[in-house]
Each structure stands twice: as C-alpha cells, then as structure tokens.
Amino acid sequence: MTADATPYVTEDGRQIGGVMMDLRDITLRFGGVEAIKSISFDIREGEIRAIIGPNGAGKSSMLNVISGFYKPQEGEVHFRGKKRPPMRPYQVARQGVARTFQNIALFEGMSVLDNIMTGRMGHIKSNMLAQAIWAGKAQREENENREAVERIIDFLEIQAIRKTPVGRLPYGLKKRVELARALAAEPDLLLLDEPMAGMNVEEKEDMSRFILDVNDEFGTTIALIEHDMGVVMDLSDRVVVMDYGRKIGDGTPDEVRNNQEVIDAYLGVAHD
C-alpha cells in the first residue's frame, strides 16, 4: 500500500503534503505492561504534529518507536510509502529523522559550536584514511559542515555563546543548543520531546517562534510532545491524544479541544 499523497488543508488554510510516516496498529509491551495499545496515526509532509496526553500515556514511548529506540511487538511503521524494517536509531537517523530529548543530552564540557557539530556526523563522508590521502577534499568537507553549523547558529540567534561551554549556560539556552544540534543533521522529520519543559514564558515564546520558523523556512516536518496546551494549540496543525497507551483523540486543535473524551481524560475543560 502506498502512502496517501493527497494534500491536506489546515484550519488556517495552509496546505500540507501527503503522508510521510504512517504508524499502523503499534503495540509496545514492557514485560506484561502495554505501554502502547494498537495505536495508528500518520504524520504528513510539512506539518507540525503534536502528541499530547497525561504523564504515563505512552507519548515518549511512541517517539522512541518512531526513532528506532524501541521495537514494537506488533504493528508496522511505514516511511514515505515503504514498510520500515527493524532499524537501529542510527539507521533511522540516516533516513532523515532527528530528535531532541525530554532530559537534555548535551556534552557539558564542550562548546556550543562543538556540540552542534556533533549533529553533522551523518554528513561526514571521509574516513580517516581518506582524510590522510585526500587532505584537500577532507578540508572542504570540514568547511562545508562548519558553514552549515554557523548558519544554524545565526538562525537560532546564539552567536554570542558559540564558544561558551554548554555547562555554563542557563536551561533555556541549553534547550536551544539541543535544537540546533538536531537541525545540524538536516532532518526531514524532527522529533521534539517536551521542547518547552522547564522554560519561563519568554523562553517559551522564543522556542515557539523558532519551531514555527524551522517548519516554515526549512520545510521540516515536526512531531512534538508538549504539556503546555496553549503552545500545542498555537503551533500544531493536527494533534493526537494518548491516555494509558490508547489513542483517545486525533484531529485539528479545535476538534481535539472539543472532544469530550479528551476533555474528561486530560484537558478538564475546553480551552478557548
């Protein structure tokens, strides 16, 4: 079965593309516990797709399935119309999938620049022997990678801290550096696990702006987990809602916020 290439029009009239990733009847177990229970949904080219739900709903487990960290016992992942065989995370990354983590995973003793450079590993083609024999080619590759990183640094407005060790940065800037490292991989699909966690209002506004700009200017498809419902409703084209490993809602932000099962399980009241 091929992916649905039919464009989709969002609530604000923006047209997004056909299906990039299709998750079909995904079930994930840890021992006798079902973390994900036969969930299906898709992610379309160019959209911002939110995954929400209470703590323990299985949201991060779903991101781990998408990124190859977890192997579901049942179900299939289809990427651009082809069934994806079992893959390790680095193989999934080579397909154009990058992610950030709920808990920041940066190299604290390294500079901002060097941390972001680690995101370019998939773009380094020359091995050590090739670098020794064809020094000029290796140098050109190094320059290209550094130029790509510098563009991201400018884009995320972190020029002033580019040489600062990450361990000295406040939390909000660390989250921005982690986003920069993920963008350095030039992903087609970017997975963000609670990108606003621990941020103050100003930091959330900045991160929201950057996420929208990444989607708009780079054309990057984004799937994100977020607990701030204001952020979710403002950023997302579509939202899937999980509760105790089940899917209880899926649709536009308006459809989700008016879904009675979602209100009862998670939102509490309809959000204006």
Tell me the role of every PLM-derived stretch.
Residues 2-272:
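Glycine-rich phosphate-binding loops of nucleotide-dependent enzymes
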